[in-house]
Amino acid sequence: MPSLIDLRRRIRAVKNTQQITKAMKMVAASKLRRAQERIINARPYASQMQRVLSSVATRVDPSIHPLLTVREPRPDSKTLVIVVTGDKGLCGSFNTNSIKAGAAYIVESPQKCMLGLVGRKGRDFFGRRGFAVLFEQVGIFQKLRYEDARVIAQTAIDAFVAGDFASRKASAA
């Protein structure tokens, strides 16, 4: 039977752990709130950028760049599905929803699909199931840089321009 001192020590340790856990939750909630605010603040810029690019694309001669040309899908054409997930499981249902959306698109797609995987959880899920993968990017979320996004985009663009894919689909929850 533990002594009274041992019991008090254990109670104090549990209280300290609760205090640390509460502080960690508050920090995580603060980071999440800031990230959500940044996303909401970026929406007007993203929608305006989409309008500008759509306007430019309709006024420019499609022959000047291969991404502007409309292609008829070939019978053997594939679709590139880019699935974005986290590297850890500490993001609620984000990973699950993103993986489900990507898997559902692959199942419903009449064309053959190939994957571009961003994040460890997506790589692990689709890798275990033997899906065809064009590229993987893991570990980029610790310090997200423009260069990481540029590499992903350039890989997808190069494959599309080479004629490997007729269309592309991004999946993120």
Give the ranges of each region predicted by the language model.
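Conserved loop-to-helix interface motifs that mediate assembly, gating, or partner/ligand docking
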Residues: 2-173
